[in-house]
């Protein structure tokens, strides 16, 4: 399992697309957080805070993570190596988890350079160090859980097709709906007392809490459950090839 985990990370980092994805992620964040005069611009925000990063990152993740996961199973299917992979002395779940943790690790690798933003704000804030570090680290944890949820979706879409582009598009659609769809339905106020429950089904309400540095057990359970559902759907998808 560990060998497969390392193989997935190496395969991504040894490809041009891997570096392009990471560079694009950092470039978009840098431009919106420091250059473009938008609501996310940290200097215009008026005080030392990483809140802008945690507000914008989910929207970048909608494209970044599907780009990371789109090849994980679809490429194996297209090249025919999926059959060899599934005959290895590993269970389907072990194969899925190796790829899942590889995907999460790649998300972490993409996030790590943003610590430069944190260091910059910490040093140049007035006074220096005038930033809520506890809340910031809590927000990073929330971003990690969000990334893990998106990775689980990307794995599933990659497992149901041998076309990487199709897997990429499907992952974007499902992650976008999971993050924004329930919030939009809630805003329409169509179901009365059920609206709040509908909102709680979406990722955004749980991420919003964690992005403020609030680590709530209910949010952790939600993210674990969400990832587990899509991991099981991926397992079912792989097992269907044996029927």
Language model region names:
Residues 1-20:
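Aromatic- and glycine-rich beta-strand/loop motifs that create alpha-glucan
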Residues 8, 116-120, 152-156, 176, ...:
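Alpha-helical transmembrane segments of multipass membrane proteins
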Residues 16, 22-27, 95, 103-111, ...:
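Hydrophobic alpha-helical membrane-insertion segments
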Residues 30-34, 47-60, 98, 102-162:
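Secretory targeting signals
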Residues 36-48, 167-237, 243:
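Terminal transmembrane helical anchor/hairpin motif
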Residues 53-75:
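Long, hydrophobic alpha-helical segments
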Residues 65-69, 117, 153, 233-234:
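Hydrophobic/aromatic residues in alpha-helical transmembrane segments
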Residues 72-102:
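Helix-loop-helix units of permease transmembrane domains in multi-pass membrane transporters
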């Amino acid at each position: 399992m560990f060998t497969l985990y390392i193989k997935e990370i190496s395969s991504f980092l040894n490809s041009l697309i891997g570096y392009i994805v990471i560079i694009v992620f950092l470039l978009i964040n840098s431009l919106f957080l420091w250059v473009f005069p938008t609501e996310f611009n940290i200097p215009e925000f008026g005080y030392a805070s990483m809140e802008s990063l945690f507000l914008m990152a989910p929207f970048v993740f909608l494209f970044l993570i599907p780009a990371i996961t789109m090849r994980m199973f679809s490429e194996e299917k297209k090249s025919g190596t999926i059959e060899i992979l599934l005959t290895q002395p590993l269970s389907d779940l072990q194969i899925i988890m190796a790829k899942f943790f590889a995907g999460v690790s790649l998300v972490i690798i993409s996030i790590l350079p943003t610590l430069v933003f944190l260091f910059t704000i910490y040093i140049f804030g007035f006074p220096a160090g005038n930033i809520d570090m506890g809340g910031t680290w809590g927000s990073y944890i929330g971003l990690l859980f969000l990334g893990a949820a998106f990775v689980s979706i990307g794995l599933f879409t990659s497992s149901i097709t041998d076309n990487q582009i199709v897997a990429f598009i499907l992952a974007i659609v499902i992650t976008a709906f999971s993050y924004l769809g329930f919030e939009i339905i809630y805003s329409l106020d169509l179901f009365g007392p059920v609206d709040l429950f509908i909102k709680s089904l979406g990722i955004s309400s749980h991420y919003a809490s964690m992005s403020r540095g609030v680590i709530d057990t209910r949010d952790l359970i939600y993210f674990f459950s969400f990832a587990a559902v899509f991991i099981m759907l991926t397992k079912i998808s792989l097992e269907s090839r044996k029927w």
